Structures are given as structure tokens and as C-alpha cells.
Amino acid sequence: MFDFRPIEIADRDRINACLAVSDYRGCEYSFANNLAWRRLADTVIDFYNDFYISCSFYDGDPYFTFPTGVKTDESGREKYIELFEKLKKYTADMGKPFALTSVSAEAVEWLKEYYGDSLKVEAERGSFDYIYESSDLIALSGKKYHGKRNHIKHFKENDWSFKLLTPDDFDECTAFAADSYDSSDKNDFSAAVEQYAIYIFFKYYDYLGLKGGALYCNGKMAGFT
């Protein structure tokens, strides 16, 4: 029924088409992120009917990012429920529970209509994305942004500069990332995975449609994104 496998660069167009249909706004709904960070949780993928399904693992238990590729209108919801029932059987055959992540508040409501009290919902604040009003970040008014105003003041007091990344900068960025990793906690698995993610981002930079920038202090790189 399902044939999960590691994500590949050749999956870009098909995955992006599914992501465009659903248009979810979490960082996990990015082909570039899915590809580059796949080693963080042993993520595997499958295409089932019109759905793009991403399955990761935590302490050996599978969890599925809320699938994309089908709209959540009335007919689409029926397809989702049908898929979830099949995934429930798939995980049950593994002796594991069925779990979804990145479920929107809207999806929770219609899932409750079907599953009732059998549906358990938990908020994972540590996984929330940060969302700011652009006008707030432009003005930085009030006590809430006092710290950010101080950061900007410190920035202006030093010989700081910013530049957009080009392929000519990738070697310097890679060396900076390696130095940062060497000074980090080697027991932090995510730090090691980050090195692989950076490698993938730079290897397929243009193909993934990425943009980046670097900060310099006194002519020396201080960070990049």
C-alpha cells in the first residue's frame, strides 16, 4: 500500500506541486527544508494518490507531517480521512501509534467532527514558527522590542556589514559553519545534521531557488543565513 523511501532532489517538482495545492505556511512545507534536513529524524516520503506524505521518527515512533496535495473542502476531507485510516492500519501493523504533526486549528476542528473524543490534540510550543507584523519590525516601538533596538544600536557602533550570498561565498560559509560546529557540543545531533543541511543547500542553491546573506564584523564573517 505504502512505499516510503528517502526524499531525492528529483522529487522537487512533484513535491512543490503538492505543496502549492495546500499552501500551508509552516517551515516543514518547504521542499528545500525537507531535502536538506531529512537526516534529522530519518524522514522518508511517499506519494499516495494525490497526496505527498512525509514520515519522520522520534524514539522509534513514526509521525506524519499533515499531508499535502489535496484541498480540505468537503470532498477533500473525505480523501484525508480515507488516507488517515490507511495510515492508522500501516502504523498499527508496525505495532506503533498513529500521530500527525503540523495540524492547523482548522483541520483539528473537522478532524474532531469525525474522530470525536478519540482524537488527542497537543500543542508543541517548541515547534511553533515565529510570526511578526512587518510594521512592528519596522517601527520597533515599545518595551517588547527594547532588546532588538539595543541589538541594532550595537550593530551600528561596530564595523558591521551585510552582503547577499553568491556561490563565491560558499567556501567561506562552509568554513565558518565547520568552525562553529567544532566549538559546539558534539553530543548535539542536530548540530551535526546542520552541517549536512548546509552542504545540500549550497549544492543545489540555484535549483532550490534559495537566497542568503552574510554578516561581517571588521571584515570577518560573523554569521550567515
Predicted regions and their residues:
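Amide-forming acyltransferase catalytic core, primarily the GNAT-like/NAT-type
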Residues: M1-N49, F189-S190
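Conserved donor-binding loop and adjoining core beta-sheet/short helix segment
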Residues: S30-A99, E106, Y216-T225
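A broadly conserved amphipathic alpha-helix scaffold signal in soluble, globular proteins
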Residues: E85, A105-K112, K153-K156, A178
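Short, charge-rich binding segments
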Residues: K86-M94, K112-Y114, K120-A123, H154
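Short, glycine/charge-rich beta-strand/loop segments that flank catalytic centers
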Residues: K96-Y114, R125-F128
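A structural signal for short, well-ordered beta-strand segments and their strand-loop junctions
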Residues: P97-V103, I131, S161-T166, A214
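Acyltransferase donor/substrate-recognition loop-hinge adjacent to the catalytic core
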Residues: G116-F189
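Short, conserved active-site entrance elements at the starts or edges of catalytic domains
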Residues: D168-M221
